[in-house]
Amino acid sequence: METEEEMKESSISMVEAKLPPGFRFHPKDDELVCDYLMRRSLHNNHRPPLVLIQVDLNKCEPWDIPKMACVGGKDWYFYSQRDRKYATGLRTNRATATGYWKATGKDRTILRKGKLVGMRKTLVFYQGRAPRGRKTDWVMHEFRLQGSHHPPNHSLSSPKEDWVLCRVFHKNTEGVICRDNMGSCFDETASASLPPLMDPYINFDQEPSSYLSDDHHYIINEHVPCFSNLSQNQTLNSNLTNSVSELKIPCKNPNPLFTGGSASATLTGLDSFCSSDQMVLRALLSQLTKIDGSLGPKESQSYGEGSSESLLTDIGIPSTVWNC
């Protein structure tokens, strides 16, 4: 019989301690079946080349599994012998002092090189007694041999020697939080990589006083367009708008309309405002004419012939201002 010290020395945690940093015990399902469970079953009571600890699941609660079985910090690997409820039956007794393991879902096949080598059963631990047990976050994958890799019956002297390999882990919210954080980081990264989506335009909805800066120049505001595919006409509009944003036309006579005053002063100011705005629009049309001359016939055709009003409307200037 092996002493406790010998078991510790042969445990996976001790083997990992001798490996370079970064190496972890992370076997695939077929490796667990063929390279570990198969050897355990064939060696029977003899010590396999690499030993996982042995746990009696009927006498051990999931949270009491020895820490030496913990591999990688999140999974517990160990051998166990299935305790059959009846000597002549195949049903397994999975009850503990405080609860029981309940199978969930269908068993999954484990293949190696296209051949069936084992099965994996998923079980969840319930506290209390069936059928009123309370479901917990403890999950177990039970691996058993199947197919041609199953040892012959004469190698099993009793039902208790029906070996299985178990992987136990505790489901918690850490994985969800990590995924959320990753998504958040991804969203932030994606947003940071996008170019600035600011298109200048003249905003006629805001207060008139905000059109003028301290040096009485017209101010072009910025607008964030929708995320949509730009057609050829929309691209042209953007070019026209950029040209408008480069205009900085002085306003010679600031009007009472912008600073407040009486009704008569406001009407007088409105006439002066329209006159001043016409200066802006003339300069604007001059710029548009230059751009229209540089466009091909197909590009300029979409605006119509002599449709100055449609040009002004497309870049955000209402026709009511032009008709002052």
From Swiss-Prot:
One MF term in the entry's GO annotations: DNA-binding transcription factor activity
Keyword hit for Lipid biosynthesis: no
PTM field: Ubiquitinated. The interaction with SINAT5 mediate its proteasome-dependent degradation.
Protein name: NAC domain-containing protein 21/22
Residue ranges annotated for the NAC domain, each copy included: 19-171
Description of its domains: The NAC domain includes a DNA-binding domain and a dimerization domain.
Motif Bipartite nuclear localization signal per UniProt: ranges: 120-137
GO CC annotations on file: nucleus
Principal location class: nucleus
Complex formation: Dimer. Interacts with SINAT5.
Compartment(s): Nucleus
Induction summary: Induced by auxin.
Alphabetical list of Pfam families matching this protein: NAM
Record PANTHER family: NAC DOMAIN-CONTAINING PROTEIN 21_22 (PTHR31744:SF96), PROTEIN CUP-SHAPED COTYLEDON 2-RELATED (PTHR31744)
Summary of the tissues where the protein is detected: Predominantly expressed in the root tip and in lateral root initiation sites. Also detected in expanding cotyledon, and in leaf primordia.
Superkingdom per UniProt: Eukaryota
InterPro entries: NAC-dom, NAC_dom_sf
Keyword terms of this UniProt record: Activator, DNA-binding, Nucleus, Transcription, Transcription regulation, Ubl conjugation
